Amino acid sequence: MEINHDYRVKLFDELGFERKQCTECNQWFWTLDKDRTTCGDSPCDEYSFIGSPITSKKYTYNEMVKEFTNFFAEKGHSPVKRSPVVAKRWRDDILLTIASIAVFQPWVTSGLVKPVKNPLVIAQPCIRLNDIDNVGRTGRHLTCFTMGAHHAFNSKDEYKYWTDKTVEYCFELMKRLGIDEKTVTFIESWWEGGGNAGPCYEVITHGVELATLVFMQYKKVGNDYEEIPLKIVDTGYGIERFAWASQGTPTVYESLFSEVIEKLKKDAGIPEVDEKIMAESATLAGLMDIENVGDLRVLRQKVAEKIGMDVDELDKLISPLEYIYAIADHTRCLSFMFGDGIVPSNVKEGYLARLVLRKTLRYMEKIGISMSIKDIIAMQLENMKEIYPELSEMKEYIMDVLDSEEKKYIQTVNRGRGIVERMAVSKSEITLDDLIELYDSNGIPPEIVKDVVDEINKKGKKTIAITVPDNFYTIVAERHEEEKPEEVVSTKKELPELEVSETELLFFKHPTQVEFEAKVLKTVEKYVLLDKTLFYAEGGGQKYDIGQLNGIEVSDVQKKNGIVFHKVSDISKFKEGDTVKGTLNWENRLKLMRNHTATHVINAAATRVLGKHIWQTGSNVDTEKGRLDITHYERISREQVKEIERIANEIVLSKMPVNSTFMDRNDSEQKYGFTIYQGGVVPGDTLRIIEIEGTDVEACGGTHCSNTSEVGYIKVLKTERIQDGVERLEYSTGMGSVSEIAVLEDILIDSAEILGIPNDQLPKTVKRFFEEWKEQKKTIEELQKKVGELVKYELADKFEKHGDYEVLVEQVSGTPNELMSIADNLAIGNKLIVLMNENDYLLCKRGENVELSMKELIRNIGKGGGKDNLAQGKYSETKEQITEKISQILNK
């Protein structure tokens, strides 16, 4: 469709705004300044607010949040509480909250759900990591920023306001803050994002963009656009930029983090840098419109020329301060990430949090900050307490996770040096892909890789090329920022697409009913489709019900597009239009109800024991056992498991009612928060809420007991770490728990009988046996070492010269451990050892001066694998044949 948007609004006509075309960038804009020839934005105009605040008073960040919110509240907008910075709490297409409108996507913007208020105002903290490498360097970039926004959702039935009022509100806010109205320009522009589009204004003053006013009214379809039912006012005001412009500080960082910056400077012993230098750098950064760090070296050169200083001297002077700026920004970002419950891991939002944290720790090391990161974040929490008290409520978790992650970081760095050294043996260049692989798979920062490679190059034995891009962390973050739907590999046959009415689910209204009558709508393959059913279809982690239809077994129940498919053993017994009698296997259903209710109970108990940060990432409810996957930053201890189990059974014994109600989506979120989505994102404007009174509330479509007392005894059977940052708890209920305890008891009794001791003596006896075994093992290892030393002398004369190396290929009697001990004694310098025993075991080990990979060698002379310095496997050829192959390899 052809779009011709008229950017003229009522305010422009009333006040005499003129439409002009910028002489620098050719963009069209509106201004009250008749003499203006440029649009006002950088790089067409430089920052003119640095050292010269543009508002009638200086505002702190907290004051600006309040001023913005109060202004729009006075204009009839209802203030709405911020959402978490973890967008995954309510949507499954992005990980982090990147804009205020993301809070209302996809449910409100699609028209499926009404907005909680209309119009509304929100000050939403957002996180974008696509500029993380620019933070600290350009003077304006932030990873975490607050998007102030007023939104209006206009429909056919409810119209609020559109372009005229939006521009009027913006201009009035500028005047209220004391900004000279002649300096304000409205640039005509176009916005696209998330599949939507619309015209917009970029609102500029003194060289800086303070707001964007978007009028979302189209859907992008290929290369064309379609109108959408809602006309959405989507504005974004940069709260931090307003505060910066009101203070006129050299960079945005001083306006936000002055206390933190001063303490970090003092701690690191960084001398004061002339404010003019930082102001010049920020101003030139604006003029260059820096959006990638490839331009930063050019920026540094321009600043050096402008102030008459050598570029290397300038770099040495301001780099430490830029690191401090970045640390200040990153620690605020981490405060929101961890405060909103992100658990560091190697995937998804946990990966991004760990990336920011490790980058911060690396910068702290680089400039020698002795303060702990916990102390810095504690300062940030205190400074934000007035506006975000909920972050301070998570302080204990935040401090614990920082402790845990800092230890992991140190271990990673220590281990990483060896990994890089081994990689470097067979490399002439460490590429960007290598750097990303080392970071993603092993957590090794690129700076550590470069340090190790530089050390190798200094030794002069070989030269390895390496270049670490200035925007490395941006590249890595962008690969992980967008949520990609997990590929689910189904073992079930794909259900057909059918045009029949959705199945009425009777178990919502009649959870204890066992029998029902229904009409057959259709039969397809082995499936019967009914107009109504009591059978629960597999979903939400819960297994399907089983039972009978007219006495014919129902062995599987699935759902697609609201239609329930009942798999029967004899489809010929059913015809369209028949009335059938359905009967549930109640014993099977009861087990599922108990285990599903137990999932909610254990999740609540785990939250009390481990903290509010835990989040359900998955569950599986079967008849015999259930399992619950939750985020947590360390292994759950034995004591914690016992406490979770104790609290869970306390909830059971407390006979808490389990209530099921259907609620409006907005009402549910407002009343209970986003924790209702623990079981996953639920579509629709109406949610089924399961509430265990005073214990747990979730949006859930499964079957549950009506009272916790019906669950029976809950036994946590085991925990395991299924991935970094995710713990799995496996449990049973009722008679299932009794059976599991009986199995454990049998193991205990059988073990005691084997040892001929009473049950209560088992731990003590096993401990004694283990200590004795360790002593014997130590003795055996010492004997093996001595044997190895003796054999060393026997084999010393059997080395043969092949190229630059001395090679030993020998068949030796002994266990793999004994052969390893012999090889350890012989593999030094330029010696290459190949040992075989009578059981076809093959061992290859090299001295430190041998460059040939043992992993590659063993693949050529046998079968096996290992590392570059040591490989093990099997052989099938004779000693002579193996020797000949090695000779050919070494004498190429």
Swiss-Prot record:
Cofactor(s) the record lists: Zn(2+)
Q: Tell me what this protein is called.
A: Alanine--tRNA ligase
Is Metal-binding found in the keyword set? yes
* Gene3D superfamilies named in the record: 2.40.30.130, 3.10.310.40, 3.30.54.20, 6.10.250.550, Bira Bifunctional Protein, Domain 2, Threonyl-trna Synthetase, Chain A, domain 2
Q: Which GO terms describe its cellular component?
A: cytoplasm
What is the documented function of this protein? Catalyzes the attachment of alanine to tRNA(Ala) in a two-step reaction: alanine is first activated by ATP to form Ala-AMP and then transferred to the acceptor end of tRNA(Ala). Also edits incorrectly charged Ser-tRNA(Ala) and Gly-tRNA(Ala) via its editing domain.
HAMAP family linked to this entry: Ala_tRNA_synth_A (MF_00036_A)
Q: Which CDD domains match?
A: AlaRS_core
Pfam families the UniProt entry points to: tRNA-synt_2c, tRNA_SAD
Give one GO term, molecular function aspect.
Answer: tRNA binding
Q: What is its EC number?
A: 6.1.1.7
Query: Where along this sequence does the record place binding of Zn(2+)?
Result: 596, 600, 700, 704
Q: What is the free-text note on the cofactor?
A: Binds 1 zinc ion per subunit.
InterPro entries documented for this protein: aa-tRNA-synth_II/BPL/LPL, Ala-tRNA-lgiase_IIc, Ala-tRNA-ligase_IIc_anticod-bd, Ala-tRNA-synth_IIc_core, Ala-tRNA-synth_IIc_N, Ala-tRNA_lgiase_arc, Ala-tRNA_ligase, Thr/Ala-tRNA-synth_IIc_edit
Signal sequence span is: none
Q: Which SUPFAM superfamilies match?
A: Class II aaRS and biotin synthetases, Putative anticodon-binding domain of alanyl-tRNA synthetase (AlaRS), ThrRS/AlaRS common domain, Translation proteins
Q: Which GO terms describe its biological process?
A: alanyl-tRNA aminoacylation
